[in-house]
């Protein structure tokens, strides 16, 4: 039986969690979803940002448990750090097929605005500078690290109400670009960050 690891990625408020609750159980038949934000809410529902470090540690431990027990699972990340590269390579050595689902927003201002709305609705805040840093680093790591190493990737524009597939890489093939204008927009952010 094939083992699957799904990495749900994108900047803050790109719609990762919302999409995960539909895509994972209903389409991919994946019942294990590890999410540091949800863990933090479980520890401190009214101030989850105060326990983010502890939630991250619990998340890493849970990922290790799932890998060691050869279970299908997914986890959420902004891709802003290189932390999970070794986890992905380790999973592949253990026979996992690793799929990255990347949810992109057309600009960082949209991410900032969505976080602002989330706060007005009672959600946790993230400073604008952190959102900007994660947005750029996520795109940079997408191209520098993760596109080359994952088995499969789906890149979506999630700026509007309905997400749109921009590019895909299936079964270790070359990346197939379905919307070259939007894919080039993402690459332009990457090239700008490399200067």
Predicted segment positions?
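P-loop (Walker A) phosphate-binding loop of NTP-binding proteins
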Residues: 11
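NTP-dependent small-molecule kinase module
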Residues: 144-195
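A glycine- and Lys/Arg-enriched "phosphate-lid" helix/loop adjacent to the NTP-binding pocket
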Residues: 96-145
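ATP-binding Walker
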Residues: 14
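Walker A/P-loop
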Residues: 17
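Conserved substrate/cofactor phosphate-moiety recognition/catalytic segment
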Residues: 20-71
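Glycine-rich phosphate-binding loop used to anchor ATP phosphates in small-molecule kinases
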Residues: 54-105, 138, 154
